[in-house]
Amino acid sequence: MRSSLSAAALLAALITPLAAQDHADNVAPGGGAVPSGWIVRADRGDAKNAKVASMGQGLHLTLGPAIILYRSDTQGSGPFHTLATFTQTKPSEHAEGYGLFVGGQGLDGAAQKYIYFLVRQDGSYLIKRRDGEKTSDVSKGWVQHAAVKKPDAKGSATNLLEVDNKRDPSKLAFLVNGQEVYGTDAKGMALDGIVGIRANHNLDLHVEGFGVHR
């Protein structure tokens, strides 16, 4: 009995670090670099292992930690529409989400709040609220949808994401590649605030066409 317990304990000790390594943040060479005017906040710790660079007509993100990326002057208030085109340049080891956030408040403190809309490489989308350290579902978890493009034969996927409160101010619509995947009553959604980009850890992304239209 004693030897069997010892073997089990040894196995657990070996498995646990390996499982932790599976979800560890990658090392991003040149991490900590951010174009002027942009602000990066990591979910955990600091953003020294996240690299954001101007590239072509957009931004290129090479990530260790999950982050939000925004400009303090990019606000959505009243009816507005925001969009960006995201190219995941290569598949991640685990399916990780990327997309937009709206209604950002207190983003530099512990009481941060925002609503985020993500897609990921398995062809699904997610909409959630963040309130400090807590998050809650708007959509029913990750939802499969044919509008979300999966990686092609070369391993890359390009998706245009939009959050639209302008076309119908009573409604908040979430679109992928021009197709509405989710819509809800805008009342009570706390939309006023900073609009920006959210990307989970270990992703390599190119972002173009980010903008807010009122």
Which residues are covered by each model-predicted region?
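Secretory/extracellular carbohydrate-interaction modules
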Residues: G64-K134
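Extracellular carbohydrate-recognition regions
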Residues: Q21-G45
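Short carbohydrate-recognition loop motifs
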Residues: K48-I68
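Positively charged n-region of N-terminal signal peptides that target proteins for export
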Residues: M1-S4
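Flexible glycan-contacting loops in extracellular carbohydrate-active proteins
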Residues: T184-G211
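Carbohydrate-binding surfaces in secreted/extracellular proteins
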Residues: A84, A153-T184
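Bacterial N-terminal signal peptides
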Residues: A7-P17
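Short, aromatic/His-centered strand-loop micro-motif at the edge of beta-sheets
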Residues: K134-L160
